[in-house]
Amino acid sequence: MAKRKVPAEFVVERDDYKCIRCLACVRVCSYGANYYDENANRVYTENYKCVGCHFCEAICPTEAITVRRNNFDIRPLAHWTPEHLIGIMKQADTGGVLLTSMGNDRPYFSYFDRIVLNASQVTNPSIDPLREPMEIRTYIGRKEAKLEIEEDGEGNVALKTEIAPQLKLEVPVMFTAMSYGSISLNALLSLARAARTIGTFFNTGEGGLPKELREFKDNMIVQVASGRFGVSADYLNAGSAVEIKIGQGAKPGIGGHLPGEKVTEPISETRMIPVGTDALSPAPHHDIYSIEDLRQLIYAIKEATRYEKPVGVKIAAVHNVAPIAAGMVRAGADYIVIDGIRGGTGAAPKVTRDHVGIPIEFAIAVVDQRLREEGIRHMASIVVAGGIRNSADVIKAIALGADAVYIGTAALVALGCHLCQTCYLGKCNWGIATQDPKLTKRLNPEIGARRAANLLRAWAHEIKEILGGMGINAIESLRGNREALRGVGLHEYELKLLGIKPAGEAW
């Protein structure tokens, strides 16, 4: 029987006139796609090995290389795309689950792109952020319903109400949970240093805490997931907050999976598992099967941290996200994290990543509204994630009801990621999603930190510009202010769920 060949996804084109046979592309490709033929004195590429990371293209000194998508031409069939056919061929070969990485790449609607912002004109003067102060500082944590002040006989006043622990963000953007193992130590160090420079936070993810990150405790959130890798009382007290991960947007309802190829000696020590074994996180926490169980864990962590740190809970955005979020707040969560269908991952079944969950825009709106209706919105902050691409997405998310956002993919792109979606292989040529020492050294954490900090610094400038144009001088005035938003080309029921009006409709 003739075997049907799986076509290459990418084609590497090489200008033989420009190529000087330096063999840099041969040496640097961790996938072994490029090779040199001494007899012909030419460099060739086995295109089926290319993942489209563009590293060879970037390091070629004469710009002789171009990597492009391979047009897999078949008889035009709307229902059977090349992606479907390639998936069937791979599964027929292996009998296995198709794995992938990064975020959902399906052509679903991006609702952020169908939402526009307001601006001040004539009757409500705009504000120049270069000449007037703009407040974008954000506090994450439980707020009090009211503040009580006490006064002594001499007219001095003091705050009587005890304030719950808060995370102070100088910009309403944090670096999301990415574990040591899924990404390299140099990548984590880049984000940690950037967070300290800007005055925000990074999240360790579920992979435990390498000793190199301990110095960043004032800008670090530690995570407790179902695998409980590296979790101890010392770990819980090592950061500024603790986050319980129930689910994530890229793979709702299933656990985590770090392939054994990525479990090196340092990862083994940090996660407390044998070298080379797959690190599997169960789908559920085996001590959480109800809101009451979640409450027990939240307060166990609060006891272990002496009630000095905010405790958050992270879930994926699913159909009944609003009542779940309300239950989490009533269970004692100081902040909740909602991760949408565009959320990224180091490894996930392709079918789950592409088809499970809901867009983050709807999740923000319905959760914020539900908490307001129940009168508990002040009891927890809302942090959202899953496809935040730029400062406009940040502003729209906050106007829909979020307090702050997490970014992951955008941060990795700042470090050099080219979204080749093969993080799970552990061969990242850019030194990000790999544990190979020969590859990780390609990412300089000092340069990475500078680039990640530059990204947040640029977004902060843009957020201030937009706020000033709206006539708003504090981000508090934008939070949940859906009158500042209008929908373009959205159906009536979509506008109703988002809580916004169509473009052209005045106040």
From Swiss-Prot:
InterPro entries: 4Fe4S_Fe-S-bd (IPR017896), 4Fe4S_Fe_S_CS (IPR017900), Aldolase_TIM (IPR013785), GltB (IPR024188), GltB_archl_type (IPR043578), Glu_synthdom (IPR002932)
Known catalytic reactions: 2 L-glutamate + NADP(+) = L-glutamine + 2-oxoglutarate + NADPH + H(+)
Organism domain of life: Bacteria
Start and end residues of each 4Fe-4S ferredoxin-type domain: 10-39, 41-70
PROSITE patterns referenced in this protein's UniProt entry, alphabetically: 4FE4S_FER_1, 4FE4S_FER_2
Cofactor: FMN
EC number(s) stated in the UniProt entry for this protein: 1.4.1.13
Enzyme class: oxidoreductase
MF (Gene Ontology): 4 iron, 4 sulfur cluster binding; glutamate synthase (NADPH) activity; metal ion binding
Chain sites annotated for binding [4Fe-4S] cluster 1: 19, 22, 25, 60
A Pfam family matched in the record: Glu_synthase
UniProt keyword Ribonucleoprotein, yes or no: no
UniProt keywords, alphabetically: 4Fe-4S, Amino-acid biosynthesis, Flavoprotein, FMN, Glutamate biosynthesis, Iron, Iron-sulfur, Metal-binding, NADP, Oxidoreductase, Repeat
Database matches in Gene3D superfamilies: 3.30.70.20, Aldolase class I
An individual GO BP term: glutamate biosynthetic process
Residues the record lists as binding [4Fe-4S] cluster 2: 29, 50, 53, 56
Similarity field: Belongs to the glutamate synthase family.
Official protein name in the record: Archaeal-type glutamate synthase [NADPH]
Native species: Thermotoga neapolitana (strain ATCC 49049 / DSM 4359 / NBRC 107923 / NS-E)
